[in-house]
Curated annotation (Swiss-Prot):
GO cellular component terms attached to this protein's record: plasma membrane
Signal peptide: none
Protein name listed in UniProt: Uncharacterized membrane protein YlbC
InterPro entries hit by this protein: CAP_assoc, CAP_dom, CAP_sf
Residue ranges, annotated region (Disordered): 29-48
Protein species of origin: Bacillus subtilis (strain 168)
Localization annotation: Cell membrane
Biased composition (Polar residues): 35-44
Domain SCP residues, every copy: 231-342
Length: 346
């Protein structure tokens, strides 16, 4: 009888514990699988805190757009994005290439490359060793926004080529040129914009904030302006390496767009199309006169500048970007599919 009573007591304790777990257990984490999973080390986040700069380009973050025009003047053009903000583009060649993201008259993101960028506390062109010496990079970064918690997890490749660190209240992505071992460019976000773009795999509690849906008509404008941004940044990189700028070639751009469109519609990623063949086949079909040609393709980057930085860190794509023989470029973007076609005229 005593054994039966003891068993009943144990059973009641187990049931009570289960009920308590269901009612008071922690909120479950959710995972958004936009990139490959990577295990994080919670203790690695501690380190030297970087404070918000009071001067330089990064000091624009969170400011009214009027502050930008006071310092930089009117933008060369204003490009739409897929993330609610508009890009204000300032292109001064190899010395300064800047895109300022403005939403509701407030700076929410920026991208910058060039030899004469004041990016305090960072310096574009600085060696990777110096960057990592002064900036502790963890395998993840945490974001808190409106009661939601996000942990963005970095792969080994992310850490080496495009890690993000917290600077004051903003997040700064550091694009590294792994072949030269230098800081190539920077991108800054406020918390909301960082979550909207999700440049890494994210584990989160709460709501996964997303940008507003983009109409087909707006996508066409985004794609066209992304093509211009890719041309701009490609030329910035070429001039930094002592090469001539590439001229835009519209027939080549139409061939490039056709390939991006074909990849999207037929759900593949390759330089060879089952329907339209190789690059040579496609250029000839498009009546493009060329002596030499090359092609870069990319998929699922957040935007044009991100795709260019990805090409820069891939040996084969980098060779095309920095090939001194090429004279003209055509770019075609269809949603998250990017194609660069390089040619040398006869």
């Amino acid at each position: 009888m005593k054994n039966i009573l003891r068993a009943m007591v144990i059973l009641l304790i187990i049931c009570g514990t289960y009920v308590l777990f269901i009612q008071y257990g922690s909120v479950p984490e959710k995972k958004s699988n936009d990139s490959e999973p990577q295990v994080s080390n919670e203790e690695a986040q501690s380190g030297k805190r970087i404070h918000m700069p009071t001067s330089g380009l990064l000091s624009f973050m969170g400011k009214h757009a009027d502050e930008v025009t006071k310092k930089l003047g009117e933008p060369e053009r204003i490009d739409p994005s897929a993330y609610d903000y508009d890009w204000w583009v300032y292109n001064q060649g190899k010395d300064q290439y800047i895109q300022i993201g403005v939403l509701n008259n407030k700076v929410v993101t920026l991208f910058a490359s060039g030899n004469d960028i004041n990016a305090k506390p960072f310096k574009i062109g600085e060696s990777t060793g110096e960057v990592f010496k002064t900036t502790q990079v963890a395998p993840f970064v945490n974001v808190e926004y409106k009661g939601n918690s996000y942990r963005f997890e970095f792969s080994e490749e992310d850490i080496n080529t495009r890690p993000t660190v917290k600077v004051g209240k903003m997040y700064v992505q550091l694009y590294m040129d792994k072949f030269e071992g230098k800081l190539s460019s920077i991108r800054a976000f406020d918390a909301q914009t960082f979550v909207k773009q999700r440049p890494y795999e994210v584990v989160y509690r709460g709501e996964l904030i997303k940008p507003k849906a983009v109409s087909d008509e707006k996508w066409k404008k985004i794609q066209t302006t992304s093509e211009k941004q890719i041309l701009d940044l490609t030329n910035v990189i070429r001039v930094k390496h002592g090469l001539a700028k590439l001229e835009w070639d519209q027939p080549t751009a139409e061939v490039a767009f056709g390939h991006s469109e074909d990849m999207k519609e037929n759900n593949y990623f390759s330089h060879v199309s089952k329907k339209y063949g190789s690059l040579k086949d496609r250029l000839e079909e498009g009546h493009v006169d060329f002596q030499q040609a090359g092609e870069n393709i990319a998929y699922n980057y957040v935007d044009g500048p991100a795709a260019v930085e990805g090409w820069l860190n891939s040996e084969g794509h980098r060779k095309a970007l920095l090939n001194s023989d090429y004279t003209h470029l055509g770019v075609g973007v269809d949603r998250k599919y990017y194609t660069q076609n390089f040619i040398k005229r006869w």
